[in-house]
């Protein structure tokens, strides 16, 4: 009550921020008359002037009003577009490192030019992040005219571009690209074997377009670079033949072999199902011993394959979750409806789906490098974003990324009419009503956009409309090549467009059709008369559509997130245009069936409802919203859980990547090698001759054999001990150390100091990369089974942290030992041989990258649902990580970032 009273008196926090920013808008507008009088040359000269002022110590905030005024005037001259006052506010919000919520059609692309121009003046690079390559290239081409005119360079990065071009794009003042490309390039850079092979500079400032889609929807899935593992895909094909013989239970307690947990996208074998599966696997010769049972240690790989095959058959549907194209299984993005070519599900799921569809089964992949979007974007010194729908996820933006959401007012009031949901008993009744609404709109000349959640639904509706003789277009993963043309015409009078999840399409639907597309089709040489005719005809259509009610949005199903529904609605009513929306639902829809309360269904049936009867009631709408909130909370838990685990990996990733950077930058790593050699020899001797021990405890023969097998050195320690009457363990260790040092000195004298330095650096990098790759595989296995610790009354997250630390320490020790062993045994005659070795390794690394899969991991892996429940059950709350604005270098005497409490040099800085 006190809060609401204070809000009434002082306004909400959002209103107070807008008032504060309006003062800066007044300053910018006051500068406009002066800036307008400048010639083109004088306006362009402002860019070097701003750079000089920044170099002299002036802050970005100080020059903001003048820089925004210059950018606005340049935009008016170059693009023919002048920023509105609300767009200036949006630009300020982005500059301040916050999220600007701006409605569809309010010109987010133009808004971004203001903070991009201002921050690019620092010369450290600005990344503009989009959801797809088309938008990245389009925006770079359109807005690049403005930036180039103002004296700033622009680059765009996309998959498959030549190495030199990509380096140049990252070296530009402003770089456009997708979130995936920026993420994969970061991982590629940290697999590079020389500075020349790297693309990116420091991560300075990023503006993320459709920020909710990238930082929330896609944050459930890590970016992974993986290479083919050695295991044959044959087992997937054999297990696939067995799964169709298993039957589904209708309920958890019913008859059958397995039941489906639809919320968690999991399949669970029943008691009877385990027995039936074992029987079938024995008959097929996949299980060898009937006594061992399915869950014996040696059969865990079979369990993994069986679970993947069950999920592929029971949960993942063709033309909903994936399509089959040119003999390949291609994933369909559940949020945007786009195909994700080149991406693969992990945990064997993709191979299981390939086996199910009868297409060639690719080898399972081994992780080479991975990162989540949360940890990628938190590495930027400054991060901001824009979207039409962020306010519903404000808590997550604040708690995970430290980003505040500011809702920007529209330039003109929104007049769209959002009609209440209509709820039907079944899908047939719902689609009859949808088809009737579409036909009514088409007759009246009102354009209609129909949003569906799957390709299957869009094609079913298309078939019904074709039979009814209604002309229409379908926009889904199968027709994405024609996307621009379809969207350009979606606002024509009476146009009917069926689209799977319009979220993130990035192109406005203009009432009357796209005038810009018609001008483009005319060509640049078209006469003014021809352009005038086009404009007159477009205006007639535009007015006719407005009179018919503007664009009408039909939603055929509620999405699991309210935000996606709002994005669909937001396609209508842009910039004060008229428009309307309505959602048609049925009790058979996934959201209603899985999450809505049973009483809604019972009540509708008790009322004797028929399939064409409809309910429009606030109580039902509230139940639907409640169901959506449940799903949103569930998905937040999954993302938070993923982040808690990846934070452990991230601490280790930072240490490894920091050490790689030091190795790449170092002229010489001799001091590192000398230090490592001392540690390795001390540990080696201590295994056979423990410190402070007596000669009866020594194993000199074992030490001699190990020195020969691991270091290629022959030392007669037994004779040496016989020759000296009094010798202790410390003296033996010193003798071995001296002998090994001499062995390395001889090698260096033989091949030359420069050759030795190059060899040391090459070996350290290669061994570190191999060790990290093997460590990631171990971490994957640890992650998959850690939730089971919850059944032993242990906290899985704490257990994961503890074991991950032990694995990491073990990996570092193995790396140190392998470096010394290789350097001791390798035979090199000249520096040219080292250079040739490095070049071969570099080419092999590039070949591995070319053969690698770039994927989003499917987080609904075996046991993922149990993981979330186990992580939450009885665990102390984990402190929420705030956005890291700057990553200082870890000093040798600083506390290690892994949290052990030791100094960095005594913990994970041991390689440095």
From Swiss-Prot:
<dbReference type="InterPro" id="IPR000185">
    <property type="entry name" value="SecA"/>
</dbReference>
<dbReference type="GO" id="GO:0065002">
    <property type="term" value="P:intracellular protein transmembrane transport"/>
</dbReference>
<dbReference type="GO" id="GO:0006605">
    <property type="term" value="P:protein targeting"/>
</dbReference>
<dbReference type="Pfam" id="PF21090">
    <property type="entry name" value="P-loop_SecA"/>
</dbReference>
<dbReference type="GO" id="GO:0031522">
    <property type="term" value="C:cell envelope Sec protein transport complex"/>
</dbReference>
<dbReference type="InterPro" id="IPR011115">
    <property type="entry name" value="SecA_DEAD"/>
</dbReference>
<dbReference type="GO" id="GO:0005524">
    <property type="term" value="F:ATP binding"/>
</dbReference>
<dbReference type="GO" id="GO:0005829">
    <property type="term" value="C:cytosol"/>
</dbReference>
<feature type="binding site">
    <location>
        <position position="87"/>
    </location>
    <ligand>
        <name>ATP</name>
    </ligand>
</feature>
<keyword id="KW-0547">Nucleotide-binding</keyword>
<feature type="binding site">
    <location>
        <begin position="105"/>
        <end position="109"/>
    </location>
    <ligand>
        <name>ATP</name>
    </ligand>
</feature>
<dbReference type="GO" id="GO:0017038">
    <property type="term" value="P:protein import"/>
</dbReference>
<keyword id="KW-0479">Metal-binding</keyword>
<keyword id="KW-1278">Translocase</keyword>
<comment type="similarity">
    <text>Belongs to the SecA family.</text>
</comment>
<protein>
    <recommendedName>
        <fullName>Protein translocase subunit SecA</fullName>
        <ecNumber>7.4.2.8</ecNumber>
    </recommendedName>
</protein>
<dbReference type="InterPro" id="IPR004027">
    <property type="entry name" value="SEC_C_motif"/>
</dbReference>
<keyword id="KW-0963">Cytoplasm</keyword>
<keyword id="KW-0472">Membrane</keyword>
<feature type="binding site">
    <location>
        <position position="908"/>
    </location>
    <ligand>
        <name>Zn(2+)</name>
    </ligand>
</feature>
<dbReference type="InterPro" id="IPR001650">
    <property type="entry name" value="Helicase_C-like"/>
</dbReference>
<dbReference type="InterPro" id="IPR036266">
    <property type="entry name" value="SecA_Wing/Scaffold_sf"/>
</dbReference>
<feature type="binding site">
    <location>
        <position position="508"/>
    </location>
    <ligand>
        <name>ATP</name>
    </ligand>
</feature>
<dbReference type="GO" id="GO:0005886">
    <property type="term" value="C:plasma membrane"/>
</dbReference>
<dbReference type="InterPro" id="IPR044722">
    <property type="entry name" value="SecA_SF2_C"/>
</dbReference>
<dbReference type="InterPro" id="IPR011130">
    <property type="entry name" value="SecA_preprotein_X-link_dom"/>
</dbReference>
<keyword id="KW-0813">Transport</keyword>
<dbReference type="InterPro" id="IPR027417">
    <property type="entry name" value="P-loop_NTPase"/>
</dbReference>
<dbReference type="Pfam" id="PF07516">
    <property type="entry name" value="SecA_SW"/>
</dbReference>
<feature type="binding site">
    <location>
        <position position="898"/>
    </location>
    <ligand>
        <name>Zn(2+)</name>
    </ligand>
</feature>
<dbReference type="InterPro" id="IPR014018">
    <property type="entry name" value="SecA_motor_DEAD"/>
</dbReference>
<dbReference type="InterPro" id="IPR011116">
    <property type="entry name" value="SecA_Wing/Scaffold"/>
</dbReference>
<dbReference type="Pfam" id="PF07517">
    <property type="entry name" value="SecA_DEAD"/>
</dbReference>
<keyword id="KW-0997">Cell inner membrane</keyword>
<keyword id="KW-0653">Protein transport</keyword>
<feature type="binding site">
    <location>
        <position position="896"/>
    </location>
    <ligand>
        <name>Zn(2+)</name>
    </ligand>
</feature>
<dbReference type="GO" id="GO:0043952">
    <property type="term" value="P:protein transport by the Sec complex"/>
</dbReference>
<dbReference type="GO" id="GO:0046872">
    <property type="term" value="F:metal ion binding"/>
</dbReference>
<dbReference type="InterPro" id="IPR036670">
    <property type="entry name" value="SecA_X-link_sf"/>
</dbReference>
<dbReference type="GO" id="GO:0008564">
    <property type="term" value="F:protein-exporting ATPase activity"/>
</dbReference>
<feature type="region of interest" description="Disordered">
    <location>
        <begin position="864"/>
        <end position="912"/>
    </location>
</feature>
<keyword id="KW-0862">Zinc</keyword>
């Amino acid at each position: 009550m006190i809060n609401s009273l204070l809000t009434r008196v002082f306004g909400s926090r959002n209103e107070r921020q807008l008032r504060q920013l309006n003062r800066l808008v007044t300053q910018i507008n006051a500068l406009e008359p002066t800036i307008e009088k400048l010639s083109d040359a004088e306006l362009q000269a402002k860019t070097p002037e701003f750079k000089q002022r920044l170099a002299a110590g002036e802050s970005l905030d100080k020059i903001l009003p003048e820089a925004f005024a210059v950018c606005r005037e340049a935009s008016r001259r170059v693009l023919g577009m002048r920023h509105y006052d609300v767009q200036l506010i949006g630009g300020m919000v982005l500059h301040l490192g916050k999220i600007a919520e701006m409605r569809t059609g309010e010109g987010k692309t133009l808004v971004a030019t203001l903070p991009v121009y201002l921050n690019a003046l620092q010369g450290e690079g600005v990344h503009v992040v989009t959801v797809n390559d088309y938008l990245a290239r389009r925006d770079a081409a359109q807005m690049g005219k403005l930036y180039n005119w103002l004296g700033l360079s622009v680059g765009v990065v996309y998959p498959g571009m030549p190495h030199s071009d990509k380096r140049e794009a990252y070296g530009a003042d402003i770089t456009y690209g997708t979130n995936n490309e920026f993420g994969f390039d970061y991982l590629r850079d940290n697999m590079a074997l020389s500075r020349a092979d790297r693309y990116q500079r420091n991560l300075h400032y990023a503006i993320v377009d459709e920020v909710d889609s990238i930082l929330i929807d896609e944050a459930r899935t890590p970016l992974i670079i993986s290479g083919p593992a050695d295991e044959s895909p044959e087992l997937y094909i054999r297990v696939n033949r067995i799964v169709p013989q298993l039957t589904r239970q209708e309920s958890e307690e019913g008859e059958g072999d397995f039941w489906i947990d639809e919320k968690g996208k999991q399949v669970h074998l029943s008691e009877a199902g385990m027995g039936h599966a074992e029987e079938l696997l024995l008959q097929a010769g996949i299980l060898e011993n009937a006594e061992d049972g399915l869950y014996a240690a040696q059969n865990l790989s079979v369990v993994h394959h069986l679970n993947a095959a069950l999920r592929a058959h029971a949960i993942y549907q063709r033309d909903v979750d994936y399509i089959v194209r040119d003999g390949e299984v291609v994933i369909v993005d559940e949020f945007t409806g786009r195909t994700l070519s080149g991406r693969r599900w992990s945990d064997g799921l993709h191979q299981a789906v390939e086996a199910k569809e009868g297409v060639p089964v690719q080898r399972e992949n081994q992780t080479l490098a991975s990162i989540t979007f949360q940890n990628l974007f938190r590495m930027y010194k400054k991060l901001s974003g824009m979207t039409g729908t962020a306010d519903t996820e404000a808590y997550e933006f604040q708690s995970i990324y430290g980003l505040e959401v500011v809702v920007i007012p529209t330039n003109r009031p929104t007049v769209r009419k959002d009609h209440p949901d209509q709820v039907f008993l079944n899908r047939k009744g719902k689609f009859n009503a949808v088809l009737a609404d579409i036909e009514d709109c088409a007759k009246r000349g009102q354009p209609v956009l129909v949003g569906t959640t799957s390709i299957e639904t869009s094609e079913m509706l298309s078939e019904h409309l074709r039979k009814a003789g209604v002309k229409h277009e379908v926009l889904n993963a199968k027709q994405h090549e024609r996307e621009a043309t379809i969207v350009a015409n979606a606002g024509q009078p009476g146009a009917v467009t069926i689209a799977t999840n319009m979220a993130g399409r990035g192109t406005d639907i203009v009432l009357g059709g796209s005038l810009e597309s018609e001008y483009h089709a005319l060509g640049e040489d078209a006469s003014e008369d021809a352009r005038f005719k086009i404009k007159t005809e477009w205006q007639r259509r535009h007015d006719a559509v407005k009179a018919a009610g503007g664009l009408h949005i039909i939603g055929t199903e509620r999405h699991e997130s309210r935000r996606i529904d709002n994005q669909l609605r937001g396609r209508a009513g842009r910039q004060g245009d008229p428009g309307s929306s309505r959602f048609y639902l049925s009790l058979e829809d996934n959201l209603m069936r899985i999450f809505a309360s049973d009483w809604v269904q019972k009540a509708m049936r008790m009322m004797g409802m028929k399939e064409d009867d409809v309910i429009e009631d606030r109580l039902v709408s509230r139940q639907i919203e409640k169901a959506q909130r449940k799903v949103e909370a569930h998905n937040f838990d999954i993302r938070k859980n993923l982040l808690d685990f990846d934070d452990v990996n991230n601490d280790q990733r930072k240490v490894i990547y920091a050490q790689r950077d030091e190795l790449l930058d170092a002229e010489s790593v001799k001091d590192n090698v000398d230090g490592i050699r001392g540690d390795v020899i001390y540990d080696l001797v201590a295994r056979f001759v423990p410190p402070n021990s007596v000669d009866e405890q020594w194993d000199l023969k074992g030490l001699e054999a190990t020195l020969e097998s691991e270091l290629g050195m022959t030392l007669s320690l037994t004779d040496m001990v016989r020759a000296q009457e009094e010798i202790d363990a410390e003296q033996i260790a010193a003798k071995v150390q001296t002998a090994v040092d001499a062995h390395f000195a001889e090698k260096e004298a033989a091949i030359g100091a420069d050759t030795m330095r190059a060899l040391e650096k090459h070996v350290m990098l290669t061994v570190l990369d191999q060790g990290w790759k093997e460590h990631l595989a171990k971490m994957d296995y640890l992650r998959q089974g850690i939730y089971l610790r919850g059944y032993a009354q242990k906290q899985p997250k704490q257990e994961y942290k503890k074991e991950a630390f032990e694995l990491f320490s073990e990996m570092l020790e193995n790396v140190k030992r392998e470096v010394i062993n290789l350097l001791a045994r390798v035979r090199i005659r000249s520096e040219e041989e080292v250079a040739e070795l490095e070049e071969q390794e570099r080419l092999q690394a590039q070949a591995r990258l070319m053969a690698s899969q770039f994927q989003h991991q499917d987080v609904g892996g075996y046991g993922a649902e149990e993981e979330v429940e186990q992580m939450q059950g009885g665990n102390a709350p984990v402190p929420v990580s705030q956005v890291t604005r700057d990553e200082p270098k870890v000093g040798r005497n600083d506390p290690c970032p892994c949290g052990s409490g030791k100094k960095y040099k005594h913990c994970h800085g041991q390689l440095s």
